[in-house]
UniProtKB/Swiss-Prot annotation:
<dbReference type="GO" id="GO:0003735">
    <property type="term" value="F:structural constituent of ribosome"/>
</dbReference>
<protein>
    <recommendedName>
        <fullName>Large ribosomal subunit protein bL27</fullName>
    </recommendedName>
</protein>
<feature type="region of interest" description="Disordered">
    <location>
        <begin position="14"/>
        <end position="37"/>
    </location>
</feature>
<dbReference type="GO" id="GO:0006412">
    <property type="term" value="P:translation"/>
</dbReference>
<keyword id="KW-0687">Ribonucleoprotein</keyword>
<keyword id="KW-0689">Ribosomal protein</keyword>
<feature type="propeptide">
    <location>
        <begin position="1"/>
        <end position="12"/>
    </location>
</feature>
<dbReference type="InterPro" id="IPR001684">
    <property type="entry name" value="Ribosomal_bL27"/>
</dbReference>
<comment type="similarity">
    <text>Belongs to the bacterial ribosomal protein bL27 family.</text>
</comment>
<dbReference type="Pfam" id="PF01016">
    <property type="entry name" value="Ribosomal_L27"/>
</dbReference>
<dbReference type="GO" id="GO:0022625">
    <property type="term" value="C:cytosolic large ribosomal subunit"/>
</dbReference>
<dbReference type="InterPro" id="IPR018261">
    <property type="entry name" value="Ribosomal_bL27_CS"/>
</dbReference>
Length: 97
């Protein structure tokens, strides 16, 4: 009896298959930035500016939340101002009735 050597023949693809790309993802926009304009009248508790970190600092009658959001403490008119040479702040000045 003749013994035959059977080769273990495996065929591989010569092109990678049409798999999914490793891109194609993005995070949701966080809607940061100014929520009230300079000169606008706002009520107490209104959000003035949403931010990460302190791009803008709180001024008169403005508080800073845990996520650095700036909000009005009293009803009044919003003013964006300079704070020194290279910083900005937002203040709320009450209007006389």
């Amino acid at each position: 009896m003749l013994k035959m050597n059977l080769a273990n023949l495996q065929l591989f693809a010569h092109k990678k298959g049409g798999g999914s790309t490793s891109n194609g993802r993005d995070s949701q926009a966080k809607r940061l930035g100014a929520k009230a304009a300079d000169g606008q009248t706002v009520s107490g508790g209104s959000i003035l500016y949403r931010q990460r970190g302190t791009h803008i600092y709180p001024g008169v009658n403005v508080g800073r939340g845990g996520d650095d959001t700036l909000f009005a403490k009293v009803e009044g008119v919003v003013r964006f101002e300079r704070k020194g040479r290279d910083k900005k702040q937002v203040s709320v000045y009450p209007v006389a009735k």
